[in-house]
C-alpha cells in the first residue's frame, strides 16, 4: 500500500481573485507563534506590506481528504514544513527523496470546465471529481498515481503537487538508500509499457512519467503551456559564467521528453543576457514534461556546461496563433465590438443593398413585365384576332362604377394633369371611408401610368412588434432580403456589449433606422427607374441627373400612400418616416407622391415635412341621389346580363329612390345594397339590414363597451350627439352649440375631433372654421333613430347624463358653500362684499333648482326602466 502524506492540513489558505490582488492569509494551525507568522508573511509577499502579490498556489487550501482513498494513511506536516513550497515556489528534497512528474492525468484542454472566471481558488480536485466517471478506467487522479507505481516497488509517496494547466503532477517519494532514482524511473516506465493507462478525457494518449532532474519552479502565473520553450543559460553563482549551449547539446538534453520540431539559437549579434535558445516540441505535453523535469538543471562541464556548469531556466514561449488572436479580441472589447459593427454595416451596404435595390425595381416595374415582352405582345394580338379572350383589355364594368367615374371625371382629369406638371408638393386625396379614393386613383387616374408603387400604411401600422412592422414595410416595396428576426438577437448582443464597454455597439437598429434603410433603398430604385429612359433619349445627354428629373415630370414614378394616418394615435414613427421620405422624393423630383387619407388633420404632419408648400387636394364626398341610383341600376344590369341573376321587375325596384335617399351616397353602402338585391332581397329589406348592422356597431363601439384610458370621449357624450342628431330635422347640429353644452364644456373640441376620427360624426367647415356636425355617413342618421327607439337604452343613457349633471351641480354648490363659509368667518362684513355674497347665494339657488328639476326627470326615467322587461 502506498502511504500518501497529505500536504493540505497545516497549509495556509490563500484566498484570492483572478490576477494580482491583495491577499488574506488564514493559518490552518491557530497555535503558530507570532514571529513564525511574520516570517511566513514576509517570505510569501517578498516585498513590503501592504503589497500586491501573485497567487502562487493553484489549489485552494481548505483541506478535504479525497473520498476515494479510503485505505490510505494520512500524516500531518509540522508547522516548520507547512509553508515549504508555498513560500519559495520550490519542492525541497531531502536525503533518500526523489521527484517524478506524471503527465496526462488532468484535462488541460478542458480547464474551462474545471474553473470558470468566477471560480476563484476553487479546488481543481473537487471539480475533477464532479465530472469524474468512476466506471471508466483511470478516471481518478489518485488511482492513476497508484497504478503508475508498481506494487513491488519499495517507495513511499509523500506528496502530490498538481499542475493543472500542464495536465500533470509532481509526485514526491522516499526510497531506500540502496535504490537508485534512475532504477525507479526505469521500473515505472516498464510498468506503464506493460500496463498503459489512458484517462477518460484523453483515451488516445497514455500517461507518461519522467524523473525530475532539475529544481522545478512551482508558480501560478498566467503562463499558458506552449510547445515552444525558452531555455535561458544562467551561471550557478554570481561570480561564475554560463556557457552558451550548442544545438547538439540541447537536443541531447531535451530529446528524451518528446519529438523536437526545431531548436533556434539566440542571434550571435544579440546583446541580450543571459543567453538563451528556443526549443520547440511537436506537442505541448512534451514541452510541459521537459520544462518541469529540466528547469533548474545544472549542465556539468563534461556535457558542455562550461567550467562552473550552466543552470537552465525554462519558461513557455507563447506562439502567435489563432488562440492568441482570440485572446486579444476577447480582451479588447472596446475596440473589437465597434469594429465588428462597422464591418457588418459595410458588408450590408456592399452586398445586400444592391440586391435590395434590384428587387425593388422589379416590384416597381412588375406591371410592365408582360407589356414590354415582345412574345407576350404577339400572343395578345393573335388572341384578340381570334376573339377568344381580351387579354390585357378591360371589358365591362363588373361593379357598375361607370356612373360614379362619369360624375367624378373632373377630379380624375385634374389628378392626371397634376402628374404632368413639375410642382414640388404633395397630392392629397381626402374623403371618408368607402368614398372610392383608392379606386379613383389606381383604377382610373393611374390605369395607364407606367411605373407606380402602392404603400398601405394600415398593414404596417397594424403589425404587432417592430420586427413585424419592418417585414410588412419591406414587403410593400419588394425590399428583400430582409432579416427582421435578427433585430431581437442584435438587441441582446447590444445589451451585452453595453454591459462590457459601457456603450451600445450598434449591432441592433431601431424601427426608425430600419424604416429609413427601406425607404432610402426605395428612393434609389425609383431614381434609377426614371433615369433608365435617359439612355434612349440622346438629346438630353448633356443634362445632369437632377436636371433630367426636373425636365421630365411625366417620366417620374408615382408613389401612392394609402390609409395615411390610420391609427396614428398609437405610434407616429411609421408616419414620421414615410412623410419625411415622401418629402425627399418630391423635393428631389424623384417621384410624384399621392396620399390617400380619411383623416381631416392630414395637413399638420404633411406641413412639417414641406412647410412652405401648398398641397394639391381632391376631396371626395358622397355621390348624389341620381348618381347613386344609376350606380345600383348599372350593377344589377351587369349581373343580369352576365346570367348570374334574373332581371328585376320595375315594381320590385319602385322603392329604390327612397332607399337610396335613406342610405345616402356612400359607395360601399350602395354596393352592399346592390349585392343584397342580387341575393333576392327587396331594396327596403337591404336598407333595413344595413341600418341594423350600423346600429349594432354604434352600440358596440360607443355605448356599451367599457371606457378606456385611450378613449377621448365618454358614453354620455356619444349618446348626447346620437340623440340630438336623430331628433334634428335636417340631420345637422351647430358646432358652437354643442361645444357650449354642459357635457362638452371641458375639452369639447378635442372630444369632437376624436369622435370624428372614430367616424361617428363628421364636421363641416366653412373657410376653415368648424360650423356644422353631421353623422359620419348618411346611413348613420337612420341608425341613430333606430338606437334611440330602444326605450330601455334611451332611459338608461339619459339617466346617466342626468346623474352626471346632478353631480356637477352638487360640486358647484360645495364650492359656493365653502366661499360663503369663508366670507362668514370674517369679523366684520365689509360693504364691498355684499354683491359677492348675493351672487354666490343666487348661484346656490340656481344650482339647487336645477338639481330639483334633474331629480324629477331621474325619477321618471327610473320608473320607465322598472317597467321595461
UniProtKB/Swiss-Prot annotation:
It is found in: Mitochondrion inner membrane. InterPro entries: Mt_escape_2_C (IPR018850), Nucleotide-bd_a/b_plait_sf (IPR012677), RBD_domain_sf (IPR035979), RRM_dom (IPR000504), Yme2_C (IPR039627). Its main location: mitochondrion. Residues 227-319 form the RRM domain. Residues 356-869 are mitochondrial intermembrane. GO terms for biological process: mitochondrial genome maintenance; mRNA processing. SUPFAM superfamilies: RNA-binding domain, RBD (SSF54928). It is a single-pass membrane protein. GO terms for molecular function: RNA binding. GO terms for cellular component: mitochondrial inner membrane. Plays a role in maintaining the mitochondrial genome and in controlling the mtDNA escape. Involved in the regulation of mtDNA nucleotide structure and number. May have a dispensable role in early maturation of pre-rRNA. This is Mitochondrial escape protein 2. It comes from Neosartorya fischeri (strain ATCC 1020 / DSM 3700 / CBS 544.65 / FGSC A1164 / JCM 1740 / NRRL 181 / WB 181) (Aspergillus fischerianus). The gene is yme2.
